[in-house]
């Protein structure tokens, strides 16, 4: 299996994600090279920080077109934390900022009156089956650090929700697109299982393509 590409655009906890996949036995490469990203059998878009800065960095490095090509070709693509948010159309962070627009919906700030960022362990419920959560019971705790949340326009893409001031989507799946708001690489054994499930999706997609 060729390495899974972890996109380096200057705004991710790349080492933790890389170490987690190494531990699981999947070959990985951290790269900002569009050619390596489009050639990879699976791609991970991590990220922490501001939405507008992230989009600016992706544009500057010529990675927006590469990510869109990966998505259109049916290659498994996983967004983590800010990486999940970037998959959507727009964010209200820093005004109205355009995202990758791979999924219709917007990113909103968590409501006033609760402690922001939402930081720590929280339960995730599964409103419908998701391939990332295979073998994981509903109500499992995962580790979060975020101030904004996704509002998908299509309810059927939502595979996980949590409650913090309000109930909101924290996991999506549509075709080859996957995303989680929590940090699987910081979520202990269950988080590793999420990454393993993604790794197996990549492996099977690669086998099916040959």
Swiss-Prot record:
Family annotation (CDD domains): GATase1_IGP_Synthase
Residues of the Glutamine amidotransferase type-1 domain: 3-208
Gene Ontology biological-process entries: L-histidine biosynthetic process
Superkingdom of origin: Bacteria
Enzyme active site: 81 (nucleophile), 183, 185
Gene3D superfamilies given in the database record: 3.40.50.880
Primary subcellular site in the record, as a coarse category: cytoplasm
PROSITE patterns: GATASE_TYPE_1 (PS51273)
Keyword set, alphabetical order: Amino-acid biosynthesis, Cytoplasm, Glutamine amidotransferase, Histidine biosynthesis, Hydrolase, Lyase
Locations listed in the record: Cytoplasm
Protein's name according to its UniProt entry: Imidazole glycerol phosphate synthase subunit HisH
EC identifiers of the protein: 4.3.2.10, 3.5.1.2
PANTHER family for the chain: IMIDAZOLE GLYCEROL PHOSPHATE SYNTHASE SUBUNIT HISH
Role description: IGPS catalyzes the conversion of PRFAR and glutamine to IGP, AICAR and glutamate. The HisH subunit catalyzes the hydrolysis of glutamine to glutamate and ammonia as part of the synthesis of IGP and AICAR. The resulting ammonia molecule is channeled to the active site of HisF.
GO molecular function, one term: imidazoleglycerol-phosphate synthase activity
Pathways involved: Amino-acid biosynthesis; L-histidine biosynthesis; L-histidine from 5-phospho-alpha-D-ribose 1-diphosphate: step 5/9
């Amino acid at each position: 299996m060729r390495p899974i590409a972890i996109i380096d655009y200057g705004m991710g906890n790349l080492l933790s994600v890389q170490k987690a996949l190494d531990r699981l036995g999947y070959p990985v490469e951290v790269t900002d090279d569009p050619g390596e990203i489009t050639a990879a059998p699976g791609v991970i878009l991590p990220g922490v920080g501001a939405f507008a800065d992230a989009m600016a960095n992706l544009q500057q490095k010529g990675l927006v077109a590469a990510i869109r090509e990966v998505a259109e070709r049916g290659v498994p693509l996983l967004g983590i934390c800010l990486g999940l948010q970037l998959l959507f159309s727009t964010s209200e962070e820093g005004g109205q900022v355009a995202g990758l627009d791979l999924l219709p919906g917007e990113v909103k700030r968590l409501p006033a009156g609760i402690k922001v960022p939402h930081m720590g362990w929280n339960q995730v419920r599964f409103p419908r089956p998701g391939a990332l959560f295979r073998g994981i019971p509903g109500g499992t705790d995962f580790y979060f650090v975020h101030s904004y949340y996704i509002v998908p326009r299509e309810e059927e893409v939502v595979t996980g929700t949590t409650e913090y001031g309000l109930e909101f989507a924290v996991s999506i799946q549509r075709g080859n697109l996957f995303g989680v708001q929590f940090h699987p690489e910081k979520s202990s054994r269950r988080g590793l299982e999420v990454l393993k499930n993604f790794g197996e999706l990549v492996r099977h997609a690669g086998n099916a393509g040959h």
